[in-house]
Amino acid sequence: MSMNENHDIQLVIITGMSGAGKTVAIQSFEDLGYFCVDNLPPSLLPKFLELMKESSSKMSKVALVMDLRGREFFDRLIEALDEMAENPWITPRILFLDAKDSILVTRYKETRRSHPLAATGLPLEGIALERQLLEELKGRSQLIYDTSDMKPRDLREKIVAHFATNQGETFTVNVMSFGFKYGLPIDADLVFDVRFLPNPFYIESMRPLTGKDEEVSSYVMKWNETQKFIEKLVDLLGFMLPSYKREGKSQLVIAIGCTGGQHRSVTLAEYLADYFKKDFYTHVTHRDIEKRSRK
């Protein structure tokens, strides 16, 4: 049996905006048993993978962090990716970490670090240049995580939920609830607006609760509008999800939004994740559930 048959490499390249969580990400992959390397120069990537393939230790899962420090660095990474695409023994995936500019600025201020591309020391200058340099790479990425509203624990859980079971063929359906008042999730593939459904927020006893509470979920689900919407939505998704899987997409992010992300969207997100778990690996997150007011 050839080495190619024995030693295929599952490669995850972690990249994205500085300050978006790459350190937490690489630590998470270490916990999952990946061989991890931080800041490998792109020009060394093909040779590094050849060494991994020929290694007697037979490392099959590799995660690399690649930060950009200029146009030349970026061009070499694109060349390395093009070269890898011709190697049948490598299954590469790019995990791109992003966050809102305001969040990145806040994180830099909290850590008292300077942005690596900010010539004048102003974070926004470096962020703008980095976004420009990363635009093509983001377009090539199989996974894009917006960490704006994530704590380090949340990012770690998201990575573990996806990669602990994903060996290159698993298709993951991530269902997310959110509140429109806090902005659209930038990593969503599909967005559905459920603000037309009756709102438990206006019932005083339910206001401090969420869609994870039985009283709220029963209220949301009892209406004819809800039942008709669910019927049409699961029919649509039942058609779309297998098609996305056949096209080789590794994950799909379905975002369900209501006004505040506490009641209706949470109820529907929980329902959808439970409904499709019999056919797909599903993961549910509630982006804005902790922002609710308990007055």
From Swiss-Prot:
InterPro entries per the UniProt record, alphabetical: P-loop_NTPase, RapZ-like, RapZ-like_N, RapZ_C
NCBIfam families, per the entry: PRK05416.1
Function: Displays ATPase and GTPase activities.
Name by which UniProt lists this protein: Nucleotide-binding protein RBAM_031990
Residues annotated as binding GTP: D67, L68, R69, G70
Record's keyword annotation contains GTP-binding: yes
Pfam families: PapZ_C, RapZ-like_N
Binding site for ATP: G16, M17, S18, G19, A20, G21, K22, T23
GO MF annotations, alphabetized: ATP binding; GTP binding
Keywords noted in UniProt: ATP-binding, GTP-binding, Nucleotide-binding
Record lineage: Bacteria, Bacillati, Bacillota, Bacilli, Bacillales
Record-stated family: Belongs to the RapZ-like family.
UniProt key word Nucleotide-binding: yes
Species name: Bacillus velezensis (strain DSM 23117 / BGSC 10A6 / LMG 26770 / FZB42) (Bacillus amyloliquefaciens subsp. plantarum)
